[in-house]
């Protein structure tokens, strides 16, 4: 199913994970009226606010922003090289490793991982994640944005990294 957003908001999935390796995809179907995505994709804990602010603004979420291609957490950002911007028609890939003491997250757009990294080999992660129970999350700054999330309920557009569960379930 697709979801269209009419106000600034963040949406969290309803299944959380605190251990394991997971992969999911979000396809941005359309952008807001200003022509930019204003979208963020990533993971958040249940403490991350919804409906009032973008996730990534607090320590409870890790979000890749499609407008500027930066990773947000706790109100600050990391700028990967190259930046990973995305817009209408793009598929955002998220791989999360919650198995070891060091929790890791990777992002990719349209089949290309950040900095040409490879989650299956455990190198090149974009961010180290604090321990906790995480939910897949999507947020938007502008009305009129729609997206389609795939948490494993159908085949993925891109290859699931080696050793990762195909989906969030």
Regions found by a protein language model. Name each.
Residues 1-169:
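PRY/SPRY (B30.2) beta-sandwich protein-interaction domains
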